[in-house]
Amino acid sequence: MANVVVVGAQWGDEGKGKIVDWLSIEADIVVRFQGGHNAGHTLVIGNQVYKLALLPSGIVRLGKLSVIGNGVVVDPQHLVEEIAKLAAQGIEITPDNLKIAENVPLILGLHRELDAHRESSTVEGVKIGTTKRGIGPAYEDKVGRRAIRLMDLAEPDTLDEKIVRLLAHHEPLRRGLGLEPISAGAIRAELESLAPKILPFMDATWDLLENARRAGKRILFEGAQGALLDIDHGTYPFVTSSNTVAANAATGSGLGPKAIGYVLGIAKAYTTRVGGGPFPTELLDETGQLIGDRGHEYGVNTGRRRRCGWFDAVLVRQTVKTCGIDGIALTKLDILDGFKEIKVCVGYDLDGRRIDRLPASQSAQARVKPIYETIDGWEGTTAGARSWADLPAQAIKYVRRIEELIEAPVALLSTSPERADTILVHDPFRD
């Protein structure tokens, strides 16, 4: 059996939570390997709705081990709050079903403050459209080798020197930005108050996962955001601060590349994006408004309305290649029910020349214009379909055309937020 990596094939918000929950029934372990609590997702199980941001989706399933890998940045305050919120919904979270890598960097109050300050800036190019949760600044400190990591809370005698090293960078930065000074004592007090609540979950997760892999356990790697937000392969600088492509499932969990088996990309049947940055197929008319209203396109964490547009086969084909995607889970097909015509982007016009990929240049990305292929819509409904026989013939044609354009098969088809409303074409764990 293959281990499975789930990644977003667009700009995030593709419906990964439902698909991961659906796959977690077969998994023994579910691992988050990058990002932080900036990637909210909603799970609908029976009559219960769970809203997660940091914890792996497997946490709501009995008998599953959830792991937060070293590639994640953890806000300890948010972690405690999310655990408490789930506990109020009847989900018990203990060190038996949740493990956190000992070397995860921590998000502190100063990171959140810095992030929010940057996003409120009126200087051109400074505002990216982040969730203001401190993710980027925390990754900056990780790369700058000054981060406070979870294991540091277990060694209070060495904590002061690490805080001093952290502030050696942040104090002059804060002065330059006009922010109030922050004391080492305040940071230490913040960490000491949270340490007893989160240290019990600490483990050498790389070792735990490797032993599980060798024992034949099925591991599901849960990506956050989407491949087009990857710090290297995304629409830079309008990206997140981590690698969101599938290869980072290994690095971000402490395993070797052979641990990755089947790569499942998640894509909506249309396209959405939150925040700034290029969006070639964006619809600024009533059609875009209609798609957003039907799809309830609002961020789980922020409540921000998502930008909406037609399916961009060029971008998804690009992420199929950068992520090594074996199959696609196509979600929200039902949102397109009733459209007389549906457009799919099959190429770009850049200064009068046709191209078949998104250029890396920021200025070129802003100039590309979509080249559309128009496909007949369907009158019947796809909502709640659980087999191909339940789908209108034209809806099937739409799916098949997408497969051709992105050069990857559709392995799963989601037709509503309910986990049972899923058409399985190929089981990723059986690869």
Curated annotation (Swiss-Prot):
Active-site positions on this chain: D13, H41
Names of the cofactor(s): Mg(2+)
Entry's Gene Ontology BP terms: 'de novo' AMP biosynthetic process; IMP metabolic process
GO molecular function, one term: GTP binding
Matches recorded under CDD domains: AdSS (cd03108)
Principal EC category: ligase
Residues the entry annotates as binding Mg(2+): D13, G40
GO cellular component: cytoplasm
Keywords (A to Z) from UniProt: Cytoplasm, GTP-binding, Ligase, Magnesium, Metal-binding, Nucleotide-binding, Purine biosynthesis
Subcellular compartments: Cytoplasm
Protein EC: 6.3.4.4
Residue numbers binding IMP: D13, E14, G15, K16, N38, A39, G40, H41, T131, R145, Q225, T240, R304
Main location: cytoplasm
Pathway the protein acts in: Purine metabolism; AMP biosynthesis via de novo pathway; AMP from IMP: step 1/2
Entry keyword annotation includes rRNA processing: no
Similarity comment: family membership: Belongs to the adenylosuccinate synthetase family.
Described function: Plays an important role in the de novo pathway of purine nucleotide biosynthesis. Catalyzes the first committed step in the biosynthesis of AMP from IMP.
Protein's UniProt name: Adenylosuccinate synthetase
Native organism: Beijerinckia indica subsp. indica (strain ATCC 9039 / DSM 1715 / NCIMB 8712)
